[in-house]
Amino acid sequence: MSNGGPKAPKDPTKKRPSIFLLYDKTIEAYKMPEGGSVSPLFLDNGRLANYAKTIGRVEDEAILELLKSAEGFRKLVHSVGVSVACENTTQEAEFVLHMYGKSDLFESGTKKTTKLVTNGSEVEIPLADIDWYGDDVCVGQFMFRFAGDWEVATIHVCLYLNDGYTAPEFIPDAPVDFNSEAYREMIAKSFVSLGNNVRLKRAIEKAKAGENVTVAFIGGSITEGAGATPSQKTCYSKVAYDRFCARFGNGDNVHYTKAGVGGTSSELGMIRYERDILGRGDKPDVVIVEFAVNDEGDETKGDCYETLVRKILFSDNAPAVILLFSVFENDWNLQERLSPVGVRYDLPMVSVRDAVVEQFYLPADGGRVISKNRFFYDIYHPTSDGHRIMADSLDYLFAQADAAPADVEPEYGALENVFCPEFVNVRLLDRKDGFDGAEISCGGFTETDKDLHYVEMNLDNYRTPVLPNNWMATEETGDEPFVIKIKSPYLLVITKDSGKPEFGKADIYVDGEYVLTADPQAVGWTHSTAQIAYRGKENIVHTVEIRKNPETKDKKFTILGFGYEAPEA
């Protein structure tokens, strides 16, 4: 009986040399307003070349350089091989090869959509079959689309090369042995300092006694859960919280607050602390602060970080503060800048960099516990394995604190500052949370922008807009300036960044003098940026004007809010 196979199957086609960009990678697709779900993988700013170097093990600089431009990509690559595997192996998905454009970053470049079946079978996309636009600058992103509202999938993407190019043979990394002695030794290296343990031990004892305890996390995209899949279950904050519950909890007495916002530094973190950490009414007993890879964007180079730490330390319920230093794929973080704050206040500190970086460069059979490929989701964010390592590093600190004798409550108020934390009483001002000491004239900023950065807070299974109570000016609302008169010795202006061409610049004036121009296009994606309009002034009424820049008067501009000095209670 025939099984329906071909009578004369073709000989196999010889595979071209290839570069794996993504191998056995787990992604999470999020619900879109128009329906379905998507998972984008961003490849601009050298990230495509970095994938080829880190995962594909390409060392040829000429090949890596070709991957940085649209012209070079088409010269090097013959075809793109893609596979997607989901629990439901019969559904359809779409893969989008999205080139970024010169005239309009997101819209004027080539977009090639290919249908896939989610059974893990590879589909090869020849570049010769693509109708290329002339405006392409670089490979911007790979996007995976699904019909459902949420999906977790495992993907592979490789580049098959044109004749004349070669690439190293791809050898998959071994999985991490989380139960090995080598793993435990690696985690122990994350321990920087126990610091004064009295506040952390107080929270531990409360949890053991069945009293309510809240463990809170504030930081950037890593704290938000970027790279973990599914993020709300496997991000480091949730896993570390679970570890704390397992060690010390009694039933459901330990509570969780997560306030990570991608692409933001402690400059915004100190402003949103009351809303995002205290806003639900819980006063945290433990706060983990994670800005070690975000604070390059802090224009004060440490003032805002120390401000946030002091704001937490001096809270009336005296919470423990733990400083967590995460790391980028290039081994970089700001530990040397920020750890002196931990030393000055004798705080518990944990360094993921100290744990993992040295062993990255050991051979697989000579001490390496986890490779960069398995630790990093992209050049900025850890995978679920990486998030677990971060959580286990915090858990190691919890265990050390539990085992140590209790210290004496320190006199934090007697300590000198490391930087200049003048913003300790900073608060958020927006359309909703006003301030009696402020007089606002909206001018042409009469609309509310709803196209915002969305994040998953706490244990929410939905995304919340960041700073939704804003002021937006459009071409139709005119170009009258936004004016705020406020009694405060400093003022920070929070504005929206966007990669969309309809957003333009705005000029900021303080007491009639020009101070800065805010350019939403500088970063190239939708998120929030805080900038100091003025500081160190007399605590009297100052006038701040925000005017559309004359070059972009026909464009939109969004003011998300302000950070001002709240009168002390």
Summary of predicted features, one role per range:
Residues 238-255:
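Signal peptide-proximal N-terminal region
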Residues 195-204, 237-241, 266-280, 302-311, ...:
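Alpha-helical scaffolding within the catalytic cores
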Residues 1-218, 223-230, 249-252, 388, ...:
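N-terminal secretory targeting modules
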Residues 187-193, 331-433:
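Catalytic His-Asp segment of secreted/periplasmic serine-dependent ester chemistry enzymes
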Residues 214-218, 223, 255-260, 285-291, ...:
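Structural recognition of the beta-strand scaffold that forms the well-ordered cores
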Residues 290-294, 304-340, 344:
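Active-site segments of SGNH/GDSL-like serine hydrolases
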Residues 221-224, 261-266, 292-298, 319, ...:
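Solvent-exposed loop/turn segments at secondary-structure junctions
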Residues 216-217, 228, 266-302:
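Oxyanion-hole/transition-state-stabilizing segment in secreted/luminal serine hydrolases
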